[in-house]
UniProtKB/Swiss-Prot annotation:
The encoding gene: mutS2
Protein name: Endonuclease MutS2
Organism the protein comes from: Alkaliphilus metalliredigens (strain QYMF)
HAMAP family (alphabetical): MutS2 (MF_00092)
Domain of life, source organism: Bacteria
One GO BP annotation of this record: negative regulation of DNA recombination
The keyword tRNA-binding is annotated on this UniProt entry: no
Domain called Smr: residue spans: 714-789
EC number(s) per entry: 3.1.-.-, 3.6.4.-
Lineage: Bacteria, Bacillati, Bacillota, Clostridia, Peptostreptococcales
EC class (word): hydrolase
Length: 789
C-alpha cells in the first residue's frame, strides 16, 4: 500500500489506538506492523476473527490475558544448557499460567461452533501445571529462592542461621567487654567481604588481634575480624558456598524441565500473542461501535452512516457515500470547512482499516471494496527544502498517481486543480478525471470549480455531490448530498453579511448568462430538494407514529385478552368454591336434622325439614344463577356424534379446542385446548366450525400462537433502554400466558445501564417470582435468569 497515502490518511493514528489496546509487547509489535492487504480470503479471515473477539467481549466481558511475556530468549538459554535466574523463571511461570487460565476460561463457557477461529487458537495452547507449580514452590521473588525448594537447601540455611547466631554472640561478647570497648570506634558489628568484623581505632590496631579486611576513607578506622571468630566465619563461608551450589542445582533442574517442552512453550507464546492481538481488535471495534463490512472485489462502495474514527464520536456527522455501481467518479463541491476533506479521509481510512482486518465505525450493511492501491492527494504537503509551490506539490503527487494507478485503485483528490489559474486548473482537473475514468479507476475529487460540476453533469459514469450549506445560519451542516451539485452561495452569504444589494447585483452582471442560468438551476434544484426532504421527514414521522400506535394497540389488546383469561380462571375457581361450600352447608343441615329426630314431634320435624329443604333449594338456585352467568352457556342440547378431531368450544372456559377421543359412557370426552388437555362433559361443549370459530376465538388464537412462537429467551442487545423495556414487558406477558416457568433475558455486558434498568423493571413485574444473574454456561453477566409465578 502507498506509504504516502498511509501517512496522509492518518492510518498510523489508528494503529496507535490499536497498539494501546494490546497487553503484551509482542502483540504491540504485531499491531505496529499491521498494513492493508489485497487478498480477499485473508481479509475475510481477519475480519471474522475480529468479529469473534467482539462477540466474546460482549457476551463475557474481558478475558484473562494479563501476564504474557516474551520468553523466547529464556527458552533458548535452557536449550543450550544454561539455567534461568529467579526473575526469568517468574516471567516464564506467568506466561504458562496465562495459557492455562485461557484454556480454562473458554472451556467453561464458549461455544466452539460460534467462535471457530478463537476456539482453534485456544485449542492449540498447552498447559504445564507441574512446571508452574515447581517454579511457584521454589521462587519467592526476583532475587530469592524459597527454603522449600529442597530439603538440602532448607537444612543448609538452618545451619547458616545457627552459625550466624554463634558469630554474632561471640562478637557481642567482644564489643560489650569493658577491656575491648575503649579500642573500638563504635560498639557495632558490621560486614566486610562477606565476613563479620568490628570497627577498631587506628591507633589501637595491635590491641585487638585479628585480620584487617578494610579501613575507612579517613584511615581512622580499621575493620578487623577478631581471631576468636575467624574459624566460625570460615565455617559460615563454607555453608554459603554449599547454599549457592544447591541453588544452582535447583535452578538447573527447573531449566531442564523447561527445556523438554521449549518448542511447545514457544508455540504457546505465538498463540498468546495472536489472541492478545485479536482481542485488541475486538476492543477497538467495541469502543468505536464498529461493524464488519461486506467486502467485494468489484469496486462497489456503500458507506452507511460512516464516522471518521479519529474525530469525537459525539460531534462527528455521519457520512453516507456510495460509488462503483452506476458511476466510478464522484465530484464533491461545497464551502470550505464544510466537510469535503473529512469525507475523503473517511472513505480512504475506512477502506484501509477494512483491508487490515479492522472493523469500521459505520452501520450494518456497509459495503467496501478491496483496492490494490489507495492514492490520496490531500492537503498542502509542499517541502520547504524542495521550494515547491502548492500547485507544484499537488501536481508532483498527481504525476506519481497517474504513473502507478490501476483499474483496481482508489484515488482521492482534495481541491483538484487548485493553486493556479482557475481556467487552466479546471481544464487540468477535467483532463485528469477523464483519464482516470477511461481507465475505470474509482475516483473521488473535491473542487470549487463550476466547470467540474458541469463536467459531472455531462459525462456518463461521473456524478455530482455536495456538502450541504445552510444560508440562513451561514454554516455548513456537514451532510453529503450525492446527485446534487454544490452552489457557491457567494452572493447569498455576502448579502447576509451586509454587502449592499446594489453591489451584489452589479457583481452578478459580470457573470456570463450561462453561469447565471447554471447557478439559478442549482438554486432551484436545492430548493426542490429541501422541500422534498421536509416532506420525506414528515412522511417518516407519520409512519413511525402509526407503527408506534399499532404496536401499542396490539399490546393493549393482548393485555386485555390475557386479563380476560385470568378473570375466567378466577371465576371458575369461585364457582367450584361455592359448590363445595353449598355441599358442606347441606351436610351440616342434614346432620342437624338427624340429631333432632328423636327430640321433636313428627309434625315439627317435617316442618323443619321442609324449611331446610327450601333453604337448600334457594342456595342451590342462587349458585346455579351465579354459575350460569359465569359459564354463559349458549346451547341447551349437547352436541351429538362427536368424534376425534371435531372442533368444539368449552363453554365454561370460552376456549376452542379439538376432541381427542370418543365419548365415554359417562358422556365425557378429552379436549385439547391450547396447551391444556381437559376432560369435559358434552353438555359443557358446543360444536364449532373448524376454521371460522377458531379464528374468531381471540383467546384460542392468542394461546395457540403464543404457545408456538414464545421462546425461552429474549435478546435485547443493541436496543436502548426504552425499546428493551417494551419488548421484555410484552415477552413476560406472553411467557406467563403459555405457562413458561423460567426464561432468559440476554442483554450483554456493555456499560451496565441496560442491565440495571431491566433489574428494576423485574422487581415491579407482577409475573416475576425471582430473578438472578446468569452463571457460567448460561451466559454469565450478560444474561438474567427469570423465574415466573
Amino acid at each position: 500500500m502507498n506509504e504516502k497515502s498511509i501517512r496522509v490518511l492518518e492510518y498510523g493514528k489508528m494503529i496507535d489506538r490499536l497498539e494501546e489496546r494490546c497487553l503484551s509487547a509482542m502483540a504491540k509489535e504485531k499491531a505496529r506492523e499491521l498494513r492493508p492487504i489485497q487478498s480477499f480470503g485473508e481479509i475475510t479471515q481477519l475480519q471474522s476473527e475480529t468479529s469473534e473477539a467482539q462477540s466474546i467481549l460482549i457476551q463475557r466481558g474481558n478475558i484473562p490475558l494479563g501476564g504474557i511475556h516474551d520468553i523466547k530468549q529464556y527458552l533458548r538459554k535452557t536449550e543450550i544448557g544454561s539455567y534461568l535466574d529467579p526473575k526469568e523463571l517468574l516471567l516464564v511461570k506467568d506466561t504458562l499460567r496465562t495459557a492455562r487460565n485461557l484454556k480454562s476460561f473458554f472451556k467453561e463457557g464458549d461455544d466452539q461452533t460460534k467462535h471457530p477461529i478463537v476456539s482453534g487458537l485456544i485449542q492449540g495452547l498447552q498447559s504445564f501445571r507441574a512446571i508452574e507449580d515447581r517454579i511457584e514452590i521454589c521462587i519467592v521473588s526476583d532475587t530469592e529462592i524459597s527454603d522449600h525448594a529442597s530439603s538440602t537447601l532448607k537444612n543448609i540455611r538452618r545451619q547458616i542461621s545457627s552459625k550466624n547466631d554463634a558469630v554474632r554472640n561471640k562478637l557481642n561478647g567482644i564489643i560489650n567487654s569493658s577491656t575491648t570497648q575503649k579500642y573500638l570506634q563504635d560498639a557495632i558489628i558490621t560486614m566486610r567481604q562477606d565476613r563479620y568484623v568490628v570497627p577498631v581505632k587506628q591507633e589501637h590496631r595491635g590491641n585487638v588481634p585479628g585480620l584487617i579486611h578494610d579501613q575507612s576513607s579517613s584511615g581512622a578506622t580499621l575493620f578487623v575480624e577478631p581471631m576468636a571468630v575467624v574459624q566460625l566465619n570460615n565455617e559460615l563461608r563454607e555453608l554459603k558456598i554449599k547454599e549457592h551450589i544447591e541453588i544452582e542445582r535447583i535452578l538447573m533442574e527447573i531449566a531442564e524441565m523447561i527445556a523438554q517442552y521449549a518448542t511447545e512453550m514457544r508455540n504457546n507464546q505465538i498463540i498468546l500473542t495472536a489472541i492478545d492481538f485479536v482481542f485488541a481488535k475486538g476492543k477497538l471495534s467495541l469502543e468505536m461501535k464498529g461493524v464488519e463490512p461486506l467486502l467485494n472485489v468489484e469496486g462497489n462502495v456503500h458507506i452507511k452512516n460512516g464516522r471518521h474514527p479519529l474525530l469525537n464520536a459525539d460531534e462527528v456527522v455521519p457520512t453516507n457515500l456510495w460509488i462503483g455501481e452506476t458511476f466510478q467518479t464522484l465530484v464533491i463541491t461545497g464551502p470550505n470547512t464544510g466537510g469535503k476533506t473529512v469525507t475523503l479521509k473517511t472513505l480512504g481510512l475506512l477502506s484501509m482499516m477494512a483491508q487490515s482486518g479492522l472493523h469500521v465505525p459505520a452501520d450494518y450493511g456497509t459495503r467496501l471494496a478491496i483496492f490494490d492501491q489507495i492514492f490520496a492527494d490531500i492537503g498542502d504537503e509542499q517541502s520547504i527544502e524542495q521550494s515547491l509551490s502548492t500547485f507544484s506539490s499537488h501536481m508532483t503527487n498527481i504525476v506519481n498517481i497517474v504513473e502507478e494507478v490501476t483499474s483496481n485503485s482508489l484515488v482521492l483528490f482534495d481541491e483538484l486543480g487548485a493553486g493556479t489559474d482557475p481556467t487552466e486548473g479546471a481544464a487540468l482537473g477535467m483532463a485528469i478525471l477523464n483519464h482516470l475514468r477511461e481507465m475505470n479507476v474509482t475516483t473521488v475529487a473535491t473542487t470549487h470549480y463550476s466547470e467540474l460540476k458541469q463536467y459531472a453533469l455531462t459525462n456518463e459514469g461521473v456524478e455530482n455531490a455536495s456538502v450541504e450549506f445552510d444560508v440562513a445560519t451561514l454554516s455548513p451542516t456537514y451532510r453529503l448530498l450525492i446527485g446534487v451539485p454544490g452552489k457557491s452561495n457567494a452572493f447569498e452569504i455576502s448579502k447576509k453579511l451586509g454587502l449592499p444589494d446594489g453591489l451584489v447585483q452589479r457583481a452578478k452582471r459580470f457573470l456570463s448568462q450561462d453561469t447565471i442560468h447554471f447557478e439559478d438551476l442549482l438554486q432551484n434544484i436545492e430548493k426542490n430538494r429541501r422541500e422534498s426532504e421536509i416532506e420525506r421527514q414528515e412522511a417518516k414521522r407519520i409512519r413511525l407514529e402509526a407503527e408506534k400506535f399499532a404496536e401499542g394497540y396490539e399490546d393493549r389488546k393482548q393485555r386485555l385478552e390475557a386479563q380476560r383469561d385470568q378473570i375466567l380462571r378466577d371465576a371458575k375457581k369461585e364457582a367450584y368454591r361455592l359448590v363445595k361450600e353449598a355441599k358442606m352447608d347441606s351436610e351440616h343441615i342434614i346432620k342437624g336434622l338427624r340429631e333432632m329426630k328423636f327430640e321433636l314431634e313428627a309434625k315439627e320435624m317435617n316442618k323443619k325439614m321442609e324449611d331446610a329443604k327450601n333453604q337448600l333449594t334457594g342456595k342451590m338456585n342462587d349458585l346455579s344463577d351465579h354459575h350460569q352467568q359465569i359459564l354463559n352457556k349458549k346451547n341447551k342440547k349437547p352436541p351429538k356424534n362427536l368424534k376425534p378431531g371435531d372442533a368444539v368450544r368449552i363453554l365454561s372456559l370460552n376456549q376452542v379446542g379439538h376432541v381427542l377421543n370418543e365419548v365415554d359412557p359417562k358422556g365425557e370426552v378429552q379436549v385439547q385446548a391450547g396447551i391444556m388437555k381437559v376432560n369435559m362433559h358434552i353438555s359443557n361443549l358446543e360444536r364449532v366450525s373448524p376454521e371460522k370459530d377458531i379464528q374468531q376465538s381471540g383467546t384460542g388464537k392468542i394461546m395457540k400462537s403464543k404457545t408456538g412462537d414464545t421462546k425461552s429467551e429474549v435478546d435485547v442487545r443493541g436496543k436502548n433502554l426504552e425499546e428493551a423495556m417494551l419488548e421484555i414487558d410484552k415477552y413476560l406477558d406472553d411467557s406467563y400466558i403459555v405457562g413458561l416457568t423460567q426464561v432468559t433475558i440476554i442483554h450483554g455486558v456493555g456499560t451496565g445501564v441496560l442491565k440495571a434498568g431491566i433489574k428494576q423493571m423485574l422487581k415491579k413485574n407482577k409475573h416475576v417470582r425471582t430473578h438472578r444473574e446468569g452463571v457460567y454456561g448460561e451466559g454469565g453477566m450478560g444474561v438474567t435468569i427469570v423465574e415466573l409465578k
